[in-house]
Amino acid sequence: MKYEILEEFLQLGWNVLLSDVDIVTVQDPMDFLHRDSDVEGMSDGYDDLTAYGAIYGVDDESMGWSRYAQGTQHMALNSGLFYLKANERTIALMQNIYKRLRKENAWDQSVYNEEIFFLTHGPVKRAQVSVRVMEIEKFMNSKVLFKRIRKLPRSRQPLPVMVHMNFHPDKTERMEAAIRYYLKGDQDALKRFPGGSEPGT
């Protein structure tokens, strides 16, 4: 249903910023969008390599001279926070996603990423959208915040635009703490939470 509704807005020529309900908005996100790509999305990555991409090596000794090859990898874009520019490519992307979800028992975030990043080949036609990854210290996931950013001296902490509590099950409590920390000046609001979901992390 979500992707059908998004397609309707795009068909009307409206650009769309979609945000899940487990997100704290600290600054106006419209002031921080670049609007130079079809899809501008938040990453589940937690550092430059996992968010923006890395080259990895494959070693097949049996190939001898050509034993070493390379691939590319990055973590998924989150299907709970993204901006879509209204055009034929993003309309096709939404259609590809919801048509698959009607037929497949699949997680929508997996299908969303497959349709964005997997390559057109043979009879398989992707929407071939252009992509920009939102900066992970502005559009933060909760792993970035609780595992790294909050440990920095306050003067060195970047001020986020939005914080998505997607990595932790106690979403409401962490959202309330982020509101107190960023919007109400409570310097101790984040301290009681573990970095991960387990005590001591």
Q: Which functions belong to the PLM regions below?
A:
Residues 72-201:
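Catalytic core and acceptor-binding pocket of nucleotide-sugar-dependent glycosyltransferases
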Residues 1-56, 76, 81-84, 88:
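GT-A fold catalytic core of metal-dependent nucleotide-sugar glycosyltransferases
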Residues 58-72:
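Short, flexible, basic/aromatic active-site loop/helix in glycosyltransferases
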Residues 17-20, 59-63, 138-144:
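A short linear-motif detector with a strong N-terminal bias
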Residues 2-5, 25-26, 66-70, 145-151:
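Eukaryotic intrinsically disordered and solvent-exposed regulatory patches
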Residues 56-59, 118-119:
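Short alpha-helical linear motifs
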Residues 47, 61-63, 167, 201:
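Functionally engaged cysteine thiol sites
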